[in-house]
From Swiss-Prot:
Organism: Streptococcus equi subsp. zooepidemicus (strain MGCS10565)
Location of this chain's protein in the cell: Cytoplasm
GO cellular-component term (any): cytoplasm
The name this protein goes by in its record: Regulatory protein RecX
One Gene Ontology biological process: regulation of DNA repair
Length: 258
């Protein structure tokens, strides 16, 4: 067999043989086999070229995927499968990428956790969950999390929640909101409690009264359509208490109204 034509197609090359066969290959394939027009090749060489061309194409796709963003091994594997790279070739592609330090799950974990410490707001439980979803083994994750101090991250996250709700909720509800927010972000309950205890959540009585008045008026409009008298009073009390208002303040408000 003889190569009758080599035609460049963007980042790839189309090789045509004089027997009608053709194959799209990467530049690495051209270089590795020193392919050129009029070159004579036998059937075994052609099979070797096809095999390496598939490997090289898959590796090229993977390198493009990780060029601008660090990826885990599983992310690269999934990407290659999605782009119809043969499952038989993927292990050798992954091995080549690992040898070249293009993918390194331990380094991925280190970078991910460090970046969260600098600019993120996630706790260890959520970080572990997200990393495991990327296919990273827990034994690579847990030692890094154990060595990381999450108190300052939790502090910043708590302050952000506080700033958002300080003018909307009474102290008890605000405390619950911050703790629940920290739990949702993957921090432990003990750390969340400790962080909240360090915050100054005291509110002046006038502010609490204003919040109670606003909430009372809103709930009154809601429940007065269906209830009246004692039943309405009970519904209002229960709803206001669930929202974190002090029992004595609620009772005073209800007595003033009824």
């Amino acid at each position: 067999m003889k190569i009758s034509q080599i035609e460049k197609k963007k980042h790839l090359y189309l090789i045509k043989l004089d027997n009608g066969d053709n194959l799209t290959v990467t530049e690495d394939t051209i270089i590795r086999f020193m392919l050129s027009k009029h070159m004579v090749i036998d059937s075994q060489q052609w099979e070797d070229i096809k095999s390496f061309a598939q490997f090289s194409y898959g590796k090229s796709k993977a390198l493009g995927f990780i060029a601008f963003q660090q990826r885990s091994q599983k992310q690269v594997q999934d990407y290659l499968l999605k782009h119809q790279i043969s499952p038989d070739l993927i292990p050798s592609i992954i091995d080549s990428l690992k040898q070249g330090k293009w993918i390194d799950d331990q380094q991925y974990v280190d970078t991910y956790v460090r970046q969260n410490s600098l600019t993120g707001d996630k706790g260890p439980l959520l970080l572990k969950q997200k990393l495991m979803l990327k296919g990273i083994a827990s034994q690579l994750i847990e030692p890094v999390l154990a060595q990381t101090d999450f108190s300052s991250i939790a502090q910043k996250a708590a302050e952000k929640i506080y700033q958002k709700y300080q003018h909307k909720l009474p102290s008890k509800a605000l405390t619950d909101k911050i703790i629940q927010g920290l739990l949702n972000k993957g921090f432990s309950y003990d750390l969340a409690k400790g962080i909240v205890s360090q915050l100054s959540l005291e509110q002046d009585s006038q502010h609490i009264e204003d919040l109670l008045d606003q909430e009372f008026d809103k709930l009154l409009r809601k429940y007065s359509r269906r209830y009246d008298g004692y039943q309405l009073k009970q519904k209002l009390y229960q709803a206001l208490y669930r929202k974190g208002y002090d029992s004595d303040d609620i009772t005073t408000k209800l007595n003033d109204y009824f």
